[in-house]
A protein has these predicted regions:
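Nucleotide-state-sensitive switch-loop elements of NTP-binding domains
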Residues: 136, 169, 173-192, 203, ...
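Extreme N-terminal, non-catalytic leader segments
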Residues: 2-14, 131, 139-194
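Residues at the beta-strand->loop junction immediately N-terminal to the Walker
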Residues: 30, 198-201
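Cofactor-cradling patches in redox/metallo enzymes
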Residues: 34, 41-143
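Long, well-ordered amphipathic alpha-helical subdomains in the mid-to-C-terminal portions
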Residues: 163-174, 369, 377-384
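Canonical P-loop GTPase G-domain recognition
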Residues: 122-138, 142-144, 334-383
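ATP-binding Walker
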Residues: 35, 200-203
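Conserved C-terminal guanine-recognition region of P-loop GTPase G domains, centered on the G4
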Residues: 299-362
Length: 384
């Protein structure tokens, strides 16, 4: 008889620690420096999600500036920097300064990992709000994150005459999505182009969008008429705790992209895009000409996105089933064009053949997003 060696959930996982807060905490988890290990930070990410926190994981090899930009654009309550490479005294003050430079010196920095006891005082003196050494329990970390939350104010505090544009946009988006009161003078305008990218989980949507943004920003450097671009990436919210793991930034090299595009991750339940139209207007009002909207992609019902965007790209991959199965899903009806991603995988020819039966005059574009293949052609089609 089979035995259960481990329960599917634990008491820690089921406990929503954030229900009584003004809003669910938004925490940016990042690894600075050359440290290539992320198992520990992934454990923390899951624990935070299972506590009701919205966790943005930026991945390995981040610079202080890339983390600061991410925290600003995501309107984070706290940055949690994991350090394992003995560079905390060097990178810590650089991160604190970078937050000042990007207009969010008020975001506290928590640092954890291999931190010698003799360095803790120095870290606090340079502006690190909390330090967590090896052996700190997940309960203590979760409680510290909960304690970091403060009610959102409509206008970002700034030492200058006006807050940084991206910082203020991030706050406007947060308040809109959470049902709060946005400043009355927030500029609003629909971007020139609003492009939806949808498809099933694992189809490579995040990688595809990151490649599209890279190609777009390269073109915009030589053609100012394109303007700037932004991304809204939606991920599912836990039906049990209300937490979320927002991992779309993992696919983006922000060390190169920097401030050339605005990226924002948001968590929703099901297809609840109730705040999307208002957010789109805020993005356009902030001066972004093109907006890519990446959907949750949770299954057959991801169709409502078409109500909010100008063009919809449906991403498919080999092995998803024959034409009847794809037609049954209903999602093919909303496509303005089809993207056959992972075109180097077995079954690609069969996928394209089956799609031709339902595509009509709609374009079918083959891509290998991880290698950048087909991305220029896809962007041409989306901008046409």
């Amino acid at each position: 008889m089979a035995q259960t060696l481990q329960t599917a959930t634990s008491e820690f996982e089921k406990r929503d620690r954030c229900a009584a807060l003004p809003h669910r905490p938004r925490v940016l988890l990042g690894k600075m420096g050359l440290d290539g290990h992320d198992r520990g930070v992934k454990v923390i990410a899951r624990a935070m999600r299972d506590s009701g926190v919205h966790v943005i994981y930026s991945g390995l090899w981040q610079t202080p500036l890339s983390l600061a930009i991410s925290a600003r654009d995501e309107d984070c309550d706290v940055i949690a920097a994991s350090m394992m490479s003995n560079s905390h005294l060097k990178l810590g003050p650089l991160l604190v300064q970078a937050l000042r430079d990007v207009g969010r010196p008020d975001i506290p920095v928590y640092m954890g990992g291999i931190l010698p006891q003799e360095d803790l005082t120095a870290l606090r003196e340079i502006g690190i709000a909390r330090c967590f050494t090896t052996g700190t329990g997940l309960e203590d970390i979760a409680n510290a994150v909960v304690e970091s939350v403060r009610p959102r104010v409509p206008v970002i505090p700034s030492a200058n005459a006006a807050p940084h544009t991206a910082a203020q946009l991030a706050r406007d988006i947060s308040l809109t999505h959470e049902g709060g009161k946005v400043r009355p003078d927030a500029p609003r305008a629909r971007p020139t182009r609003v492009i939806g990218v949808t498809g099933s989980p694992g189809a490579g949507k995040s990688t595809l969008v990151s490649q599209l943004v890279g190609e777009y920003t390269r073109r915009a450097e030589g053609d100012s008429s394109l303007g700037r671009c932004a991304v809204l990436a939606f991920d599912p919210m836990s039906p049990i705790t209300g937490g979320a793991l927002l991992g779309d930034r993992l696919r983006v090299d922000f060390n190169r992209l920097g401030d050339k595009a605005y990226y924002r991750s948001l968590a929703i339940r099901g297809e609840d895009y109730a705040s999307l139209n208002a957010i789109i207007e805020l993005v356009g009002g902030a001066g972004y000409a093109t907006l890519f909207v990446e959907t949750v992609g949770a299954g057959q019902n991801e169709t409502r996105i078409r109500e909010h965007v100008d063009r919809t790209a449906v991403v498919l991959t080999p092995g998803m089933g024959d034409a009847v199965q794809m037609d049954k899903a209903g999602i093919l009806e909303i496509a303005d064009l089809f993207v056959c991603n992972k075109a180097d995988h077995p079954g690609e020819h069969e996928l394209v053949r089956d799609l031709r039966d339902v595509a009509g005059r709609r374009a079918i574009i083959e891509t290998i997003a991880t290698q950048g293949q087909g991305i220029p052609e896809l962007l041409d089609a989306l901008l046409a």
